[in-house]
């Protein structure tokens, strides 16, 4: 779970302001429109005095003639300013959400693999979607309410003091009480909002796990377990929502109760003869109407605090991610195409938060153009070696050299351009077959090159059977393809990149025997003149490796070629007998 920095609301808003400020022109236009909108309401109310005192009281027909035109004019102003303010605020809000999401997305892409290993996908998706929307709410809806209702309150106060300053002074007494009430509930709102955002991440994670693993849920009868899990997180979300509603609902009647006392005091004060002498029917109507009209903006300002605090809590959550250090890329060394000589020197590695090393004093030399296979039981540390070679993680002790230079001396982009990776967990994008093969480099390769890579990976036989061939959209993570077909697309991607270093992380594990034989020929061709690190589950695929390294509990326990290791009758020979049933 991420730790949110304990920033005050003001400090949080100050950090948010640089995101909003580029669009301040829209905010200024919206603010002017909102003030004019509020002013039109105030002027509409002020028309009551001349209407009652002169129009009806003194039978002044001229007032009755221009009054309808004034009402129509004010309503036109109100309608136009309402449209302008809504449009400008929506424009600013959309820009702010887009900016925050882009910044968050870009920052997450630069985070180390360890960050994603420690966070659930659902929680991160909730940060990009739900939390970003909450921030927009604090910078749009809250702003509308504060400016419009604030202008209304100021306008109503000015009008009240203009007509009867004696009665209006009573309202000044309740202002500090209202302020204290709002402050008391603000902290409560912020804490509940933080909990709601965390719970929303849990809801998203629970739903995502069920959707992605629905086949496993069905085959293992996990419907009850998943339903109970989802019910639990949904109920926590409901409870947090009810706490928020309770806090908000309590604040409303408190404000109204305070206002009712103020109205009662005004009525009492108006009964004094010295005050009554200064009042007319129009004056008392306008003052009382203004006091009642103040209830709505006061209530709105109280409610906006809920949304504003929710947005500020979301800001703190997002800032906690943006404050995390991105993947270190301090290397300066550039290389167009490496020779591919790789050496692990006394490499020890601990996963973050672990006391036991995943790898302990690993020494491996992969000569350029040679193939080294890593063999061992599940969890022995084979894939960790591949993760270190690509610098998904950095070594804890020791060093890894590429062509005599420490991997950390290379710029990350330059280093990873030297490596093609085919793993057992193939990820494909919801795009065409061709775009998946040429992923991120569509403009670099011709159609003929893409097709040739697919042919060498023995993928064209099933691609040609698709409705649109290479232009067929394969769905999210290649849902329309079988496991073997997805693996062949990944191999075609590696063939097309033509990198000097190749990592095969159980690349044929998802293939049937016939497909494996077909693709093994392509892999043999792919490995020629390339430094290959092969992590093997099927030992038959690595019998021709230049060296086989056996890993056990993060240590190298055996090394040699296939025939030598069989003669030693050690761990490799035991694994071989288990696999072939000897």
Swiss-Prot record:
Residues of the ABC transmembrane type-1 domain: 28-310
Domain notes: In MsbA the ATP-binding domain (NBD) and the transmembrane domain (TMD) are fused.
Species of provenance: Yersinia pestis
Major place of residence: membrane
Binding sites annotated in the UniProt record for ATP: 376-383
Topological relation to the membrane, as annotated: Multi-pass membrane protein
Self-association and partners: Homodimer.
Sample GO molecular function, one term: ATP binding
Protein name, as recorded: ATP-dependent lipid A-core flippase
Biological process (GO), any one: transmembrane transport
EC number from the UniProt entry: 7.5.2.6
SUPFAM superfamilies recorded: ABC transporter transmembrane region, P-loop containing nucleoside triphosphate hydrolases
């Amino acid at each position: 779970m991420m730790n949110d920095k304990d920033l005050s609301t003001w400090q949080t808003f100050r950090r948010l302001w640089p995101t909003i400020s580029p669009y301040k022109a829209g905010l200024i236009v919206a603010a002017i429109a909102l003030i004019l909108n509020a002013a039109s309401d105030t002027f509409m109310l002020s028309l009551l005095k001349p209407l009652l005192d002169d129009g009806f009281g003194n039978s002044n027909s001229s007032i009755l003639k221009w009054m309808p035109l004034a009402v129509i004019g004010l309503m036109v102003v109100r309608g136009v300013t309402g449209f302008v303010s809504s449009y400008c605020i929506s424009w600013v809000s959309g820009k702010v959400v887009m900016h925050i999401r882009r910044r968050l997305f870009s920052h997450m892409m630069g985070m180390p693999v360890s960050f994603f290993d420690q966070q659930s996908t659902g929680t991160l998706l909730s940060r990009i979607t739900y939390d970003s929307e909450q921030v927009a709410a604090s910078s749009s809806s809250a702003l509308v309410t504060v400016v419009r209702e604030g202008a209304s309150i100021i306008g109503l106060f000015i009008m009240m003091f203009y007509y009867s300053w004696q009665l209006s002074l009573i309202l000044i007494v309740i202002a500090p009480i209202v302020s204290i009430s709002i402050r008391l509930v603000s902290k409560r709102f912020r804490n509940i909002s933080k909990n709601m955002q965390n719970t929303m991440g849990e809801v998203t994670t629970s739903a995502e796990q069920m959707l992605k693993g629905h086949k496993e849920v069905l085959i293992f009868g996990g419907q009850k377990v998943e339903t109970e899990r989802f019910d639990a997180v949904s109920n926590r979300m409901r409870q947090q929502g009810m706490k928020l509603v309770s806090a908000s609902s309590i604040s409303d009647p408190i404000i109204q109760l305070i206002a009712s006392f103020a109205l009662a005091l005004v009525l009492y004060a108006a009964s004094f003869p010295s005050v009554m002498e200064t009042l007319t029917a129009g004056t008392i109507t306008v003052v009382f109407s203004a006091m009642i009209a103040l209830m709505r903006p006061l209530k709105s300002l109280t409610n906006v605090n809920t949304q504003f605090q929710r947005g500020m809590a979301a800001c703190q959550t997002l800032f906690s991610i943006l404050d995390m250090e991105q993947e270190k890329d301090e290397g300066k060394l550039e290389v167009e195409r490496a020779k591919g000589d790789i050496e692990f020197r006394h490499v020890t590695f601990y996963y973050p938060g672990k006391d036991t090393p995943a790898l302990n004093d690993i020494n491996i030399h992969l000569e350029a153009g040679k193939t080294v296979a890593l063999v061992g039981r599940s969890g022995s540390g084979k894939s960790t070696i591949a993760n270190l070679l690509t610098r998904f993680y950095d070594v804890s002790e020791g060093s890894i050299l590429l062509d005599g230079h420490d991997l950390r001396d290379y710029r990350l982009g330059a280093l990873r351009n030297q490596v093609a990776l085919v793993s057992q967990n193939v990820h494909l994008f919801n795009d065409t077959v061709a775009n998946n093969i040429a992923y991120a480099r569509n403009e670099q390769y011709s159609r003929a090159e893409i097709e040739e890579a697919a042919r060498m990976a023995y993928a064209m036989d099933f691609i040609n059977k698709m409705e649109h061939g290479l232009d067929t959209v394969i769905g999210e993570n290649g849902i329309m393809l079988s496991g073997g077909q997805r693996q062949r697309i990944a191999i075609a991607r590696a063939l097309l990149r033509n990198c000097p270093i190749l990592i095969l992380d159980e690349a044929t594990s998802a293939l049937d025997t016939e497909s494996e034989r077909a693709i093994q020929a392509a892999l043999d061709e792919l490995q020629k003149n390339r430094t290959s690190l092969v992590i093997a589950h099927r030992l038959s695929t690595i019998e021709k490796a230049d060296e086989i390294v056996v890993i056990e509990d993060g240590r190298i326990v055996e090394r040699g070629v296939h025939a030598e290791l069989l003669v030693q009758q050690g761990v490799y020979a035991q694994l071989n007998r288990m696999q072939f049933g000897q």
